[in-house]
A protein has these predicted regions:
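Phosphate/dinucleotide-binding and metal-coordinating scaffold of catalytic cores
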Residues: 1-332
Length: 332
């Protein structure tokens, strides 16, 4: 499809020269058009178990998704090299192993909004309904509209790309980058102190959320002539709503928490481990724990604000299960 000519970041390689890169080529879409487009989105195999029986939620390959362009307040199908501006994520369908993730749209929206109210820079996401199709509509942060009205792609790389690793090894246990390696890259960002603490605290909140898919491809940096810096957070989903469907050892974090021993298994990680983890990611451990204490104090208000923002068709049970799981860790 023409939408398939879009790309992440700013560089696109094509087999033949492409005309019209300095103009917007758009086809207007009504809500009914979008409903049909979402319904016809190609379904792929979603989640499963790795060879080592570790449950992974890889959103990049799990959710059915498409992308469209919002221009002058209306939705369009982009043609040629015209960039998309928003990603549409559809609910993850029931899996062959019986796992039900049909509320994945509500789950991801809740996690992102909750983290925004905790002070994190996260991708802007809203739940939208087009006829009988429900989707999480995520604004792309690697796009920018210029003064000339054109939509430009911004250069970004995920942490696997930035650290020269294959995307297939995005999980640390499979050879992907871990927290210390990513933190070392952020030591030299153009906003190093803020980026390093944001990254550390994001890992902590992923633990609260049971966000076990926080792998290296779910953290990215912008790049320009001045250097690199952390992008907004994205692709956050909680396993709290379906944790009871898995054995204890199956729920593992994408990156280990480093203490006297290294910890991947979510249930083995304790509050005290984060102090050592901070030190091993080049941070002042006392200051880092102070930030955690302050964040914990904001959790109740952040949860309340998130529920207050929920639309009428939001699945409240999903939010309740995530909130209960978060509070069970904060109140230890």
């Amino acid at each position: 499809s023409e939408i398939g000519r879009d790309c992440v970041g700013s560089l696109s390689l094509t087999a033949e020269p492409v005309d019209g890169i300095d103009e917007l080529k758009l086809e207007a879409m009504s809500h009914a058009d979008i409903e049909a487009h979402l319904r016809n989105t190609v379904r792929r195999k979603t989640l499963g178990m790795d060879d080592d029986d570790v449950f992974r939620i890889s959103l990049a390959g799990a959710q059915e998704k498409t992308a469209l362009t919002l221009h002058e307040g209306k939705w369009h199908r982009p043609l040629g090299t015209t960039p998309t501006t928003h990603i549409f994520k559809l609910p993850i369908h029931d899996l062959e192993n019986g796992l039900k993730l049909t509320n994945s749209v509500d789950n991801e929206w809740f996690c992102l909004r909750f983290m925004r109210y905790l002070g994190f820079n996260v991708a802007q996401a809203d739940i939208r309904t087009f006829g009988d199709q429900k989707a999480l509509v995520v604004e792309r942060f690697d796009r920018q509209q210029g003064e000339d009205g054109l939509i430009y792609r911004l250069t970004q790389e995920d942490m696997c790309q930035a650290l020269g690793r294959a995307g297939q090894s995005k999980y640390e246990a499979n050879g992907g980058p871990g927290a210390s390696e990513i933190a070392n890259l952020l030591r030299f960002s153009t906003d190093s102190e803020n980026d390093m603490y944001q990254f550390f605290l994001a890992q902590y909140v992923f633990w609260l959320l049971m966000g076990i898919d926080g792998h290296a491809k779910n953290f990215s940096v912008y790049l320009d002539h001045t250097g690199h810096w952390l992008t907004p957070l994205y692709d956050v989903i909680s396993a709290h709503p379906f944790r009871n469907q898995f054995r204890r050892k199956e729920l593992r974090m994408a990156m280990k928490v480093m203490s006297k021993n290294n910890h991947y298994i979510w249930a083995d990680i304790q509050m005290r481990h984060w102090k050592s983890h901070a030190a091993k990611t080049f941070l002042n451990d006392e200051l880092a724990m102070g930030y955690i204490e302050a964040l914990n104090a904001d959790v109740d208000v952040a949860l309340s604000k998130t529920f207050a923002d929920a639309s009428e068709d939001f699945d409240k049970k999903t939010g309740d299960l995530i909130a209960e799981g978060v509070l069970s860790k904060v109140r230890i």
